[in-house]
A protein has these predicted regions:
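N-terminal regions that are enriched for targeting/export leaders
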Residues: 6-55
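Active-site nucleophile-adjacent alpha helix/oxyanion-hole segment immediately C-terminal to the catalytic cysteine
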Residues: 54-118, 122-230, 305, 309-310, ...
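Hydrophobic alpha-helical scaffolding
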Residues: 59, 68, 134, 290-294, ...
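Conserved small/polar residues in nucleotide/adenosyl-binding loops
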Residues: 392-397
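Core regions of eukaryotic protease modules
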Residues: 173-308, 320
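Bimodal feature
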Residues: 2-22, 72-75, 88, 245
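Active-site-adjacent substructure of cysteine-protease-like catalytic cores
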Residues: 130-134, 168-172, 177-182, 186-189, ...
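Glycine- and acidic
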Residues: 54-64, 130, 283-290, 348-352
Length: 397
């Protein structure tokens, strides 16, 4: 191995101090920070929030201090449809309701994975992976569809937010503490030679404890409820005796089994035109698996535009923190000029960023509009985020 010598460091000092530009940038960045010093005027001027296709101006929802973006994004696509269909001024579906059942299902998913890997050492990569984070707030499109199909949805007024749904840190801490303890109980039971029926009975006992914990933290989800609202013309509507499943079927009315996650992952190990899944990723045991269809970026954009032209907003995920100006509400590769501003060359392409862990999907949002040129190609996208509204420039192929 090659150590860093004093002579080499002396040369670095000399090279840096020989540049007048570096001294000016050092003053600007140390006083203002990297983003504030390198923010480009050009990006703000060119990326005005005006779109040739704009599907909604509904109020923006807020996930607060939780990782529920994927739920908010999916429920927002439903609420856009419901607001338009039923002529509502504003409306929200309960994100906390979906959150409750996700925590419940993820707990069972984790315990089933623990049972399935009971013959492996605690130091095995799979068991270590499971125990590192037994469950967390995040998820994928197929996971939220599994929840909707099994548990339905309810209006937010029927099952409102709680402290633990809006700020999930404490809930996750104690739920993971319980699940790791339960993992030890089940592994030791299996190691003692217990039969499947005994293990299943113990798991159900543990799930009752988890259910009780979730109810005390989030509230008891309703089995039946009434739904009343006034439309934009002030006409009153009401319906009683609804269940979460009947409400979902009647008021959402989307065939979610017809939808699939389409991704652009231009890595050598993932040829286009094929679907992929991730081992040990899911929430509802016995439901649809998480799957992604890999396509070129231009095809992905064509599909998103076609869906919006058909009047439907689009659930999507991205690496939201890469190049974003949250104050301006702009996400664009030219929002900061790192290369000229710091004399740094960022040449790694998307495949390289994915392969070398520089990028991954971190956040789900909703495409609600797009600005098209005369040839129908996207210039920029209107994005509804559960932090606020954003503008995305169109990604290159």
């Amino acid at each position: 191995m090659s150590e860093l010598t004093k002579e080499f460091t002396d040369q670095l000092y000399a090279n840096y101090q020989a540049s007048v530009k570096f001294a000016a940038l050092e003053n600007a960045i140390t006083h203002n920070g990297i983003h504030a010093a390198l923010e480009t005027r050009k990006s703000a001027v060119e990326n005005t929030p005006v779109f040739s296709l704009d599907l909604t101006k509904d109020k923006v929802t807020d996930q607060k201090a939780s990782g529920r973006c994927w739920m908010f994004a999916a429920l927002n696509t439903f609420r856009h449809k419901m607001i338009a269909s039923f002529q509502l001024e504003d409306f929200e579906l309960s994100q906390a309701h979906t959150f409750f059942w996700d925590k419940y299902e993820k707990s069972n998913w984790f315990l089933e994975q623990i049972i399935a890997t009971a013959d492996q050492d605690l130091t095995s990569r799979k068991v270590a992976f499971l125990l590192q984070t037994p469950q967390q707030d995040g998820g994928q499109w197929d996971m939220v569809v599994s929840l909707f199909e099994k548990y339905g949805v309810v209006p937010k007024s029927v099952y409102p937010e709680s402290i633990s749904s809006s700020n999930s840190r404490e809930l996750n801490t104690y739920l993971n503490k319980l699940l790791r303890q339960d993992a030890q109980i089940l592994r030791e039971l299996l190691a003692s030679g217990a039969d499947q029926a005994t293990v299943q009975s113990k798991k159900e006992e543990l799930l009752q404890e988890i259910f009780n914990f979730l109810v005390m933290s989030l509230g008891l989800p309703p089995r039946t409820f009434s739904f009343s609202y006034r439309d934009k013309d002030n006409n009153f509507h009401t319906e009683s005796g609804l269940t979460p499943q009947s409400f979902y079927k009647k008021y959402v009315d989307l065939q979610l089994e017809d939808y699939v996650s389409v991704i652009n992952a231009p890595t050598a190990d993932k040829p286009y035109g094929q679907s992929y899944t991730v081992e040990m990723l899911g929430n509802v045991v016995g439901s649809r698996e998480v799957r992604y269809l890999n396509v070129p970026m231009e095809r992905l954009k064509e599909l998103a535009i076609a869906q919006m032209k058909a009047g439907e907003t689009v659930w999507f995920g991205s690496d939201v923190g890469q190049v974003s100006n949250r104050k301006a509400g702009i996400l664009a590769t030219d929002v900061y000029d790192f290369e000229a501003g710091m004399d740094i060359q960022l040449t790694q392409d998307k495949a390289g960023r994915l392969d070398y862990a520089e990028s991954l999907m971190t956040h789900a949002m909703v495409l609600t509009g797009v600005d098209l040129d005369e040839a129908g190609r996207s210039l920029k996208w209107k994005v509804e985020n559960s932090w606020g509204c954003l503008l995305y420039t169109s990604p290159s192929p």
